[in-house]
Amino acid sequence: MERAEGGTMAERALELDKVRAGYGETVVLEDIRLALGASETVSVIGRNGVGKTTLLATIMGHTTLHGGRVSLHGKDISGIATYRRVTEGLGYAPQEREIFPSLTLRENLEVAARPGPWTMATVFDLFPRLAERADNRGNQLSGGEQQMLAIGRALISNPTVLLMDEPSEGLAPVIVEELARAVKSLTQASGLATILVEQNSRLALDIAPRAVVMDRGRIVYDGPSETLAQDPAKLDRLIGVGRK
């Protein structure tokens, strides 16, 4: 398997070493080895059910770890609670768009805020649409606005590693394009290490210079996005298009 190295040991923001994980006794991930350099952006693609969301859940501490280690900036975080992983520097925008529906958009950001470069103003600069809706409650926002808010909430906690799970899911194409432009701008300029899980392979390969393909709970490709973008047949083989 082709494999890209995510920086030197001193530069690695996040590392999964021989990780085996799942839910209870059910193992979903096998022998996951992934290193993410500081300021590096990686997309994770693959069919539904291959373990992409479980990968992020394992990094956040939501799964049962059956083997291996998860390290953040060289520190083993495998045995610590999720809330402590957040204080150590993980930011997470989950697939479920976890926001407080009865709070205003502004209040949703305020409760997640921690000191650092990301503030209400910088989130609004990234997502101007949110500034226009700042005083609307969470349950009054569209799906696209809720997704932008979920990412904004993760950012305003001022992480060093940002995890995003399926940000384009269920959104209209015009909103997907708007969101993609913002996410690409974010990953290029923020200095954050970022893992983007995305079902839309074309979108993922455009945003992230490095791609990871998963199949049946394992990483089957880790290398340049450009290689896959230029060879759709190879991407289809890796993902398992047409396989029953």
Locations of the language-model features?
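ABC ATPase C-loop
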Residues: 154-155
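Catalytic Walker B motif of ABC-type/P-loop ATPase nucleotide-binding domains
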Residues: 162-166
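Helical segment within the ABC ATPase nucleotide-binding domain
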Residues: 177-191
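ABC ATPase NBD coupling module
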Residues: 64, 76-97, 120, 132-136, ...
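Helix-to-loop junction immediately C-terminal to a conserved catalytic motif
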Residues: 60
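The feature captures the beta-strand-to-loop junction immediately N-terminal to the Walker
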Residues: 45-47
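Conserved ABC transporter NBD signature motif
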Residues: 68-76, 88, 118, 122-125, ...
